[in-house]
């Protein structure tokens, strides 16, 4: 498994940031519903974190009902969780991130044409 270079933020525990990465992976189908997640060791190596940190991220995802353990096999993403995550993440984005982004776009006079073309001309 290829390492993913990652810059961890100082204002949040690494296991929480790792959980966010895994949730993003569920949302973008890197970790599809019903599929196995990497082993704790594999996840730790991939993100260059301590295996205890990877295990804690998995425990918290399990506690949140997003993944389940299959005895002797590992963890899988539970079926049906992506839709709920998508709803939650959209609501969070619209409440927490969009207002600031929209204000910045207005200050810079960026319109939809510019956004979709990727050009300021």
Label every PLM stretch briefly.
Residues 30-31, 35, 63-72, 78-79:
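Beta-hairpin "wing" of winged helix-turn-helix
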Residues 1-36, 42, 86, 92-121:
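Extreme N-terminal segment that seeds HTH/winged-HTH DNA-binding domains in transcriptional regulators
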Residues 75-76, 119:
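Conserved beta-strand edge residues that scaffold enzyme active sites
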Residues 36-68:
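N-terminal helix-turn-helix
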Residues 45, 60-63, 75, 94, ...:
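General helical structural elements
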Residues 82-84:
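A short, flexible beta-alpha/helix-coil linker loop
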